[in-house]
Amino acid sequence: MFRIVLTIAILATAAPAWAELPVAITYLRLEVDRPPVLSNLDPVPEDLGVAGAEIAIADTQTTGSFLGHSYSLTLASIPPGGDLTTAAREALKTSRLILIDADPATILSVADLPEAQGALLFNVSSGAENLRSGDCRANLLHTIPEDAARTDALMQVLQRKQWQTTVLVTGSHPADQAFAEALRRSATKFGITIAAEKDWTFDTDLRESTMDEIPRFTEGFPDHDVILVADETDDFGRYIEHNAWLPRPVAGSDGMVPTAWASVIESWGAVQLQNRFEDHALRPMRGLDYAAWAAIRAIGEAVTRTGSSDPATLRAFLLNPDFQMDGFKGRGLSFRAWNGQLRQPIAVVNSRALVTLAPVEGFLHQRNEMDTLGLDEPESAC
């Protein structure tokens, strides 16, 4: 069983009667059973990702209505454990432009469907390296940053601040383990030392005992400049800062966080996007919202420039070295031709302010400085 909801035909101005070019987009989502966490202060929004797609459709239709382009967005949301490929087959009958919000294995299963050959798919949720390397697919582009881009951004900041020695605390969930591995690779890449590691194994409520338990947990660490936290499920990281044995900054999944988007980004016209999103969703924009927004804006830019909704035509345009689009992050966004990853600055933020945008000044690249973040062409098996 799966649920299909017509989310939006047009959020903004209705398409004129003479519209000749329909552009049908589907958002495929595999819902997730979230593991229990210590705090519910920041619940995951039910419309995470979807809300970003909705405002992107509104933004895109504003221009499209003048050109005879009519955009529509359909949401197919599958309960946890359901079969997203069944919904994908149904969606591909009427839409050849698909956003996928799912785990890496499910994304690949959709991309490999016979019905998906010739379609254009956008991964808006998974930062897994294999999707950009050995398991890349010609019909799959990525607007969510890869984990390696986020961790590379963080290590550039640590290197710039000369915080050379770190320790690492890793949670028990697969997403935590994957992020920890990305942190290790990035640390090696940028010459940052991880002097010691510990696994987070507590399964009791620490909210009333953090001042006792966290110092004991971190007391045995050798001297360090920063505590790295791999806690992608938002379970324990918030309790490490200000409770550790040594007074050190926290970075990674909590503290100083590398992310695609955050509510503290204010420059480069970002406030306009933030305000439009909050007016629509009644909450701040998150990274997955931004990835969905970027995917539809990329589609809209390609349709506007080519006058076509053909997936092959749009893909060729998006992968052209001359393609750029504005992403409200100070640099033009473009796609890497070798693995379909959207090049984008990574915001390194704390809960109240933007620390910086990576790539950090001084980290150079022969082609594009944003290629210092994540898998560069020689590193990808794509």
Feature locations, PLM:
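Extracytosolic ligand-binding ectodomains
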Residues: F2-I8, W18-C382
